[in-house]
């Protein structure tokens, strides 16, 4: 692995002018291309302390073996040169918004003497005009079949065209008037091209003129009593209107714009673009790409807020529209159009918005506006595109997560990276959630074979490491780890006693070893006991301090067969106990992706429980502690008396006058109101409550479950566990 200091340019040799630079690997291949307003400032940032660089950037500079640069006069020239180099060298560390060849498009071969219309998948070629892409090929064929009665252009291949030209008879479409049959000379080449140009104008959004022309011809035919021609033109107008109905009007007539939206996570970004022409959505396109390795001041970036979004927007605009302009070529120039619309709507402006806008205007040949929609129909459409981008990223993640091969590779990769004895088939992860030390809770999620096992999820209300507005995440991690593995040790002891036929009360906690298979099966359900086995891998959300705390607890409990790691946010580093440096997994590896999913699921489960507990605390009242008094009757009491203060002054007889309230309940209400109001913890959460019905259910079901004392051991602890009803 090259040392960046070995190829760092000599001091003072890098110019301060704007320019474009490229890194090459030791074999001479270009691996990264970037631009900068000041080459010296940007390149020096790459040769700072390697440990402070973002992992993706660190990998790039340690892979490179040399760096070169080219000085330009303006930032717009730098933008153009950067695009050209990325297109020429295809660097591995640059984002590439490659055109998705799986989406079908409608192609028009304007470079042929008799242009052809056909559905196409594949790389774009010069001289061919494309409409779309569309989500389904049948949608294009349906629209094309509808329009051929109005624009009877050629759709056959070159071989079919040549054969019918030789035999002197048109194909079936020629006989049913869905082709003008240029192969047999029914129309000249110029007349056929005019039909194709009208077809392109219609799909480009210039629809009103064509409809008005057909209606005028229909009226003329009617006045001349040529009712057969008038009827055919009437049907043509109807066909055009039906085709237009398939494309809803989303913006004002005459609006030509592209609307782009982004959905990102730590590693990838989903991009969606809606192409609006003539106020109607004419096509949709999407990508899911790996994020680039540009040097970013990650210390000041809030990754959850998406602060790297402006850079992604700039990269997308330069690559996508540069490619579109190159593909348009002379064909679109002759047609009076371009691959760049008059307006581009983005979620945020790129860092060099003025230069990008000037560059886009140069590609189009006229002014292009780069805007962020703030209100109205454009804002609503941008929100729709954003939902599509978010959904695309989620679907991409689900496809990867559901793939058995990728899950197997992820588990195998984790085993190799962490030097484990076997693949971690059971992974548990802990996360802490609180707001300034209040309502401190933890979650424990379980993944088996790379998939979530939601029936084994657990919530914890932090007791020892929190309270009075204080919170210690490291101590909270230690507390949850201790509670989870104390339960495991007790369960192992009970199961061993049951398997040996001994009295469970005479068995103390075990050491976390393996069980006989029959001991791990619940005789009542026939299913494996939920926590009969320890995890192969115990993950904590955090860095070295959190990992050290969890590891110390396991050592204290004598558990030696559970590996502990920590996954730090932002840099996505894997921390191992006793190691000074973290393990860096490749950013595109399935192993890191699985660990991120586990960590993110623990975060989601913890924050959902925290919000539920905080909401209960903020809306708690003295009436909450009255047994048998539910939500409906509490509301009835407050509504009847007007306030809790007036209810406190009422007599038993006055309270029983409220429908559904008996004497015993009335006395319990007065007793509760006369005593000190209980805290939220008294009526709060149950310990170790399973997530039985998916996310968010455990919070609701755990409210009345008594807490389990942490300090109990042996038979007393077993009895307490049985009283709580927790498995």
UniProtKB/Swiss-Prot annotation:
One of its GO terms (cellular component) is cytoplasm. GO terms for biological process: nucleotide-excision repair; SOS response. It comes from the Bacteria. Residues 701-711 have a biased composition (Basic and acidic residues). CDD domains: GIY-YIG_UvrC_Cho. Keywords: Cytoplasm, DNA damage, DNA excision, DNA repair, Excision nuclease, SOS response. Its main location: cytoplasm. GO terms for molecular function: DNA binding; excinuclease ABC activity. Residues 718-727 have a biased composition (Polar residues). The keyword rRNA-binding does not apply. Belongs to the UvrC family. Interacts with UvrB in an incision complex. The UvrABC repair system catalyzes the recognition and processing of DNA lesions. UvrC both incises the 5' and 3' sides of the lesion. The N-terminal half is responsible for the 3' incision and the C-terminal half is responsible for the 5' incision. HAMAP family: UvrC. This is UvrABC system protein C. The lineage of its organism: Bacteria, Bacillati, Actinomycetota, Actinomycetes, Mycobacteriales.
